[in-house]
């Protein structure tokens, strides 16, 4: 077993590196646990088999090359594992995750295990096409520059008829929002079949565009029970002239997501990604996967927007960590910085960026903080923060747009929003 623990190993530029937070069972030394993680997530199995002799395990095995105790925690360690590039199929997030996190989390020697970060080398990231369009192309399509974009999730999320749904969309867009959004739970239920919804929403889009002179969008949720149906919905959205569709990438799966991203790239649709189910995976501090890994894999799989939490009203430490994965979504090159939870330097080599979407419990009073924290390249999404306005949807949308324009102008004139 311990041949998988190799502290003298020098990592290669082409290795995929992983940082695992391990909690070994009592009595299991951390080196043994680290070796077990490296073995089980690469070439090893529970015993030595004679067919090991038919290949060069030295060439293909994962190696645990460093272990450090976690500050302030008893019996928790960060194990660093290096995987040779040949273990993974090119351009497949599905295969990457199946290999690295597929089996090892049920391991008996471990009480808990969490994948904190992955370093994706350029040699591997270059096999992915990434986001269908990216931040710059999206701005050019929408002709909107120099400010964050505004969105709104239509509420109540379930129960509206297609016609009333379209009316709510129209009021929000007419009031000044850039986007409205299907809730992630809206697919094609008996009271709101997808085709009816798409038609009424398209009508709302074009009416509000004609009246405001701005390009408008609505994230039409194309998520479906199977891939063919999903693509069919995306095709219909494109035929209606909608600029953007949406996908729930964790419940839909990475294979479906990459398929949809390919379609969107080839047909000029933007792709909005919702992270429904993420907390099942990333909520526990000592088990599962950190959201920054889900964010990195999404950037590879493909999406132009992804929900990334809000920061506002959370603890200060959370803020730095959230900004860490916001940078991982947007920037080309991100330096290692443990205070922000970034375990490895990540070089995306000009893969297009993803716009982080701030949504969940935010309203106009948060606007100065949000513009300060997220900057221009983001989507600020107010659901109840728009629709909860005492005068209705359109005035709620106006309030958001006015607040945003005021904050952006104040910032451009040199005022310190954070201090104020």
UniProtKB/Swiss-Prot annotation:
Q: Does the keyword Magnesium apply?
A: yes
Catalysed reaction equations from the record: 2 (2R)-3-phosphoglycerate + 2 H(+) = D-ribulose 1,5-bisphosphate + CO2 + H2O; D-ribulose 1,5-bisphosphate + O2 = 2-phosphoglycolate + (2R)-3-phosphoglycerate + 2 H(+)
Q: GO cellular-component terms in the record?
A: chloroplast
Task: Please report the PTM annotation for this entry.
Answer: The disulfide bond which can form in the large chain dimeric partners within the hexadecamer appears to be associated with oxidative stress and protein turnover.
- Key words, A-Z: Calvin cycle, Carbon dioxide fixation, Chloroplast, Disulfide bond, Lyase, Magnesium, Metal-binding, Monooxygenase, Oxidoreductase, Photorespiration, Photosynthesis, Plastid
- Annotated site, Transition state stabilizer, chain positions: 314
Residues the record lists as N6-carboxylysine modifications: 181
Q: Where in the cell is it found?
A: Plastid, Chloroplast
Q: Tell me its cofactors.
A: Mg(2+)
Where do the catalytic residues lie?
A: 155, 274
Q: EC number(s) of the enzyme?
A: 4.1.1.39
GO MF, one term, reads: ribulose-bisphosphate carboxylase activity
Q: How is the cofactor bound?
A: Binds 1 Mg(2+) ion per subunit.
InterPro entries assigned to the protein according to its UniProt record, in alphabetical order? RuBisCO, RuBisCo_large_chain_AS, RuBisCO_lsu_C, RuBisCO_lsu_C_sf, RuBisCO_lsu_fd_N, RuBisCO_lsu_N_sf, RuBisCO_lsuI
Q: Does the keyword Disulfide bond apply?
A: yes
Organism domain of life: Eukaryota
Enzyme class, spelled out: lyase
Q: Cite the record's note on assembly.
A: Heterohexadecamer of 8 large chains and 8 small chains; disulfide-linked. The disulfide link is formed within the large subunit homodimers.
Give the family this protein belongs to, as stated in its UniProt record. Belongs to the RuBisCO large chain family. Type I subfamily.
Functional summary from the UniProt entry: RuBisCO catalyzes two reactions: the carboxylation of D-ribulose 1,5-bisphosphate, the primary event in carbon dioxide fixation, as well as the oxidative fragmentation of the pentose substrate in the photorespiration process. Both reactions occur simultaneously and in competition at the same active site.
Also noted in the record is: The basic functional RuBisCO is composed of a large chain homodimer in a 'head-to-tail' conformation. In form I RuBisCO this homodimer is arranged in a barrel-like tetramer with the small subunits forming a tetrameric 'cap' on each end of the 'barrel'.
* This protein's name: Ribulose bisphosphate carboxylase large chain
């Amino acid at each position: 077993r311990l041949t998988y623990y190799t502290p003298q190993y020098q990592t290669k530029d082409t290795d995929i590196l992983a940082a695992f937070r391990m909690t070994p069972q009592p009595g299991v030394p951390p080196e043994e646990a680290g070796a077990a993680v490296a073995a089980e997530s690469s070439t090893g199995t529970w015993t030595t088999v004679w067919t090991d002799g038919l290949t060069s395990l030295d060439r293909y095995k994962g190696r645990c090359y460093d272990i450090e105790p976690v500050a302030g925690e008893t019996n928790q360690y960060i194990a660093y594992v290096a995987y040779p590039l040949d273990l993974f199929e090119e351009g497949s997030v599905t295969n990457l995750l199946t290999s690295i996190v597929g089996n090892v989390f049920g391991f008996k020697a471990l009480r808990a295990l969490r994948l904190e970060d992955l370093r994706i080398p350029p040699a591997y990231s270059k096999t992915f096409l990434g986001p269908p369009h990216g931040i710059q192309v999206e701005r050019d399509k929408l002709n909107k520059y120099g400010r964050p974009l505004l969105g709104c999730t239509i509420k109540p999320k379930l129960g509206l008829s297609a016609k009333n749904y379209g009316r709510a969309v129209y009021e929000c867009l007419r009031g000044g929002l850039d986007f409205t959004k299907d809730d992630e739970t809206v697919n094609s239920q008996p009271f709101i079949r997808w085709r009816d919804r798409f038609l009424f929403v398209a009508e709302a889009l074009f009416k509000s565009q004609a009246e405001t002179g701005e390009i408008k969008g609505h994230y039409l949720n194309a998520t479906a029970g199977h891939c063919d149906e999903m693509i069919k919905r995306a095709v219909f959205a494109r035929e209606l002239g909608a600029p953007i569709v949406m996908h729930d990438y964790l419940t839909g799966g990475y294979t479906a997501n990459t398929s949809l991203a390919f379609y969107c790239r080839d047909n000029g649709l933007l792709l909005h990604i919702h992270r429904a189910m993420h907390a099942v995976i990333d909520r526990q501090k000592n088990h599962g996967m950190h959201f920054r890994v889900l964010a990195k894999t999404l950037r590879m799989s493909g999406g132009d927007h992804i929900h990334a939490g809000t920061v506002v009203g959370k603890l200060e430490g959370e803020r730095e960590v959230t900004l860490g994965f916001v940078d991982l979504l947007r920037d080309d090159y991100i330096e290692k910085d443990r205070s922000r939870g970034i375990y490895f330097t990540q070089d995306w080599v000009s893969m297009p960026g993803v716009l982080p979407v701030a949504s969940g419990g935010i309203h106009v009073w948060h606007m100065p903080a949000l513009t300060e924290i997220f900057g221009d390249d983001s989507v600020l999404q107010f659901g109840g923060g728009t629709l909860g306005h005492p005068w209705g949807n359109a005035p709620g949308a106006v309030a958001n747009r006015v607040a945003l324009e005021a904050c952006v102008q104040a910032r451009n004139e040199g005022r310190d929003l954070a201090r104020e």
